[in-house]
């Protein structure tokens, strides 16, 4: 692997990051401290992803009032229609939002690199590594999420094929501009074309969803939920005097999940709107949320109360003392993050948009801290920043992707959103996550500094990682297709085959990481 030299300290390592006396500590101790802090930042990303996901659900519930006149009776018909399209929600909100840690990290790295002729290495390395993490470990988790024996398949195969095409084309395009068009150089036009292709992805996915002629694949759509928001596996009871805590009904068997999941179903300010909370008028056309009169300030205050509560209702219901202690300990560890994120306004305000934007701002702040910590780890250990980027950073910043896909795989009746989040996130990583930072750097260089393109310092290593990714991803997609043909679904099925598929996906990820690391280290 990479050459690690604890004895040598680069000049930049003389600056402290956490406290004044840290530069006097041995490099090994400093590396350990920075690694712990980095892991804690990833826990923060995991925690904020829960708030992000809930705010996104609130945005998706937003509907508009449509008034029509019955041509036969001249009666006025009032009904509510969803504002967001199902597919656009997957491509835009879900994929873009869960990829925001990688995007913000790459953008911050580019801004720090302004005025340089060579691009920063953290952004591209993280995004390619994140693509591998999204495709392999997240698929490995999702395939075992459905309950034993149950199956979940993609209902709209045409949309998935469109998203898969743009996902693979994104990395083919990246290889073309790195090795074929202008080898190891990024021009302003290449960066601009990269960003514009995200708009083409949105348009093509929407066209496929609407089955526009000539530009869509003529495949029938299977059954899928009318509402994008995942349905609950079990209802959640509330009383009229809301206290901020929803109790999970007995028999759900989610003790472990609720301890370690970033998005607990019990409290922490996330209030479910189950199907029975949505009432239908006698005409069957008007929806009413029974919580619409809840005062937002009391809900916001409840977020701080929940953040200060170490023992949740789930922990109190656990029969095992050990699990209860683990739950309390975990809540104690994440208490600072919970208290900080309690300042995010409730998602009930402005249909969740304020909470959505605030969540992205917090994610950007954590991503900036991650870049600084990574610089110090690379400095005191001698490990290549690129190796750190596509391993530790890629896994850590992809955690919101994992949480979102896991929740979708558990709660939705189809596999569309769980798998679409993976393929769309990989597309967003290139078109936005790499395109925008490179566009910022190339525009600055062309307009203000050198009048020259942007050079890629480690283009050979990046290109090799892309080739390995292509080879391993082909093996992944082939297995998903075989599961659909033989077992009838991409996710779930017999537990033995589900776990075998999961292990296979993890092996593919290990192969990618090992080969890419050996290439960067000069071993191969």
Curated annotation (Swiss-Prot):
It holds the Pfam family Na_Ca_ex. GO terms for biological process: metal ion transport; transmembrane transport. One of its GO terms (cellular component) is vacuolar membrane. It is found in: Vacuole membrane. Keywords: Ion transport, Membrane, Transmembrane, Transmembrane helix, Transport, Vacuole. It is a multi-pass membrane protein. This is Magnesium/proton exchanger 2. It comes from Oryza sativa subsp. japonica. The lineage of its organism: Eukaryota, Viridiplantae, Streptophyta, Embryophyta, Tracheophyta.
């Amino acid at each position: 692997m990479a050459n690690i030299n604890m004895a040598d300290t680069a000049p930049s390592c003389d600056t402290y990051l956490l406290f004044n006396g840290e530069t006097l500590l041995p490099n090994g101790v400093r590396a350990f401290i920075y690694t712990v802090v980095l892991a804690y930042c990833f826990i923060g990303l995991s925690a904020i992803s829960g708030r992000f996901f809930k705010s996104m659900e609130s945005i998706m519930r937003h509907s508009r009032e449509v008034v029509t006149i019955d041509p036969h009776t001249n009666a006025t018909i009032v009904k509510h229609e969803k504002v967001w399209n199902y597919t656009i929600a997957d491509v835009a909100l879900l994929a873009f939002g869960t990829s925001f840690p990688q995007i913000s990290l790459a953008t911050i790295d580019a801004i720090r690199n302004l005025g340089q002729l060579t691009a920063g290495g953290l952004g591209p390395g993280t995004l390619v590594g994140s693509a591998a993490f999204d495709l392999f470990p997240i698929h490995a988790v999702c395939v075992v999420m459905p309950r034993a024996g149950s199956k979940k398949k993609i209902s709209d195969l045409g949309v998935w094929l469109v998203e898969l095409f743009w996902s693979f084309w994104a990395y083919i395009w990246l290889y073309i501009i790195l090795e074929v068009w202008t080898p190891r150089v990024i021009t302003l036009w290449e960066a601009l074309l990269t960003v514009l292709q995200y708009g083409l992805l949105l348009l093509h996915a929407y066209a496929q969803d609407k089955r526009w002629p000539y530009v869509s694949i003529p495949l029938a759509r299977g059954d899928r939920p009318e509402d994008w928001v995942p349905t609950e596996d079990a209802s959640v009871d509330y009383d009229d005097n809301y206290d901020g805590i929803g109790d999970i009904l007995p028999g759900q068997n989610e003790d472990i999940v609720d301890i370690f999941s970033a998005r607990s179903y019990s409290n922490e300010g996330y209030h479910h709107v189950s199907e029975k909370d949505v009432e239908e008028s006698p005409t069957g056309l008007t929806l009413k949320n029974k919580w619409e009169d809840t005062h937002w300030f009391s809900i916001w205050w409840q977020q701080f109360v929940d953040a200060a509560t170490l023992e949740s209702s789930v922990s109190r219901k656990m029969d095992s003392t050990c699990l209860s202690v683990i739950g309390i300990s975990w809540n104690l560890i994440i208490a600072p993050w919970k208290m900080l994120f309690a300042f995010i306004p409730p998602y009930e305000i402005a249909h969740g948009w304020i909470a959505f934007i605030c969540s992205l701002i917090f994610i950007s702040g954590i991503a900036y801290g991650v870049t600084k910590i990574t610089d110090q780890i690379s400095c005191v250990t001698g490990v290549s920043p690129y190796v750190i980027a596509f391993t530790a950073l890629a896994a850590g910043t992809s955690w919101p992707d994992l949480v979102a896909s896991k929740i979708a795989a558990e709660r939705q009746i189809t596999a569309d959103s769980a798998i679409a989040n993976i393929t769309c996130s990989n597309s967003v990583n290139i078109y936005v996550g790499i395109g925008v930072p490179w566009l910022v750097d190339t525009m600055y260089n062309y307009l203000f500094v050198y009048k020259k393109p942007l050079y890629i310092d480690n283009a050979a290593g990046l290109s090799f990682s892309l080739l390995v990714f292509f080879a391993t991803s082909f093996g992944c997609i082939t297995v998903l297709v075989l599961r659909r043909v033989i077992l009838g679904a991409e996710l779930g099925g017999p537990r033995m085959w589900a776990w075998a598929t999961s292990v296979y996906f993890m092996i593919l990820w290990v192969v990618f990481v090992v080969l890419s690391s050996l290439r960067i280290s000069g071993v191969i």
